[in-house]
Amino acid sequence: MNPMLNIAIRAARKAGNVIAKGYERRDDLQTTLKSTNDYVTNIDKASEEAIIEVIRKSYPDHTIITEESGALEGKDSDIQWVIDPLDGTTNFVKGLPHFSVSIAIRVKGRTEVGVVYDPIRNELFTAVRGEGAKINDMRLRVENKRDLAGTVLTTGFPFKQTRLMPMQFAMMNNLIQDCADFRRMGSAALDLCYVAAGRVDGYFEVGVKAWDIAAGDLIVREAGGLVCDFNGGHSYLTSGHLVAAAPRIVKEILNKIQPCLSDEFKK
């Protein structure tokens, strides 16, 4: 096994244990408002600490980029661990059992390893660049549909940028003319993994951060899917808007959503 993958799995499982225990004791949860509609809990922070501890034991010089602490610079800035210690915090707070740990390892700007762990279902999604994607050691492949007919798509709402809601609804209105249904599940990392597993047929969202999607991005691509921004480019880790699906479905989604894009997205 790739040594960094092994450490990423160890870190994800340790963080998952922290989250699962915290989920059982939500009466003790401490919640803080970070910004509009955006919360952080003591479990987010404890999960992050568990991940950092595992990484630092094996790779003390690597740079770590996390949702809660930002960039923790190491001597080796070429290798970056991009972490969301609890993707789906709102679900966690509300008692909805759908959230995950997301860990990506990027080497000189390219994602080499992706790990997403769902501690409630004990599902471990992994990928190494060029070696395929797996769930609990079983190979993953995207659902290779030819068009949008009968597809179920997952998305998220730009709750931190509510000015984008009209565009979001316009995109959904165009897509529902051909697809079967939507799901809004609340964890971008798991949305991407579910695309890779064929549980949903595609995913699109605006306003996500690199730590939400870096691991899931690789998992989709290694499962035979395509990930791009709303213009068909590769800037999604920085722009925060993306589409993920089998290649033909990505093309169909782009054809539907591009007429709805506001000027700031037409670049």
From Swiss-Prot:
Q: Which GO terms describe its biological process?
A: inositol metabolic process; phosphatidylinositol phosphate biosynthetic process; ribosome biogenesis; signal transduction; transcription antitermination
Indicate yes or no for the key word Metal-binding.
yes
Q: Which InterPro entries match?
A: IMPase, Inositol_monoP_metal-BS, Inositol_monophosphatase-like, Inositol_monophosphatase_CS, Inositol_monophosphatase_SuhB
User: For this UniProt entry, what is the primary localization, expressed as one broad class?
Assistant: cytoplasm
Q: Which domain of life is it from?
A: Bacteria
User: Which positions make up the signal peptide?
Assistant: none
Q: Which cofactor does it need?
A: Mg(2+)
**Class of the enzyme per the UniProt entry, highest EC level:** hydrolase
Q: Where does Mg(2+) bind?
A: E67, D84, L86
PROSITE patterns reported for this sequence: IMP_1 (PS00629), IMP_2 (PS00630)
Family membership:
Belongs to the inositol monophosphatase superfamily.
Role noted for this protein = Part of the processive rRNA transcription and antitermination complex (rrnTAC). The complex forms an RNA-chaperone ring around the RNA exit tunnel of RNA polymerase (RNAP). It supports rapid transcription and antitermination of rRNA operons, cotranscriptional rRNA folding, and annealing of distal rRNA regions to allow correct ribosome biogenesis. This subunit may play a central role in organizing the structure.
Any idea what this protein is called?
Nus factor SuhB
Annotated organism of origin: Pasteurella multocida (strain Pm70)
What gene codes for this chain?
suhB
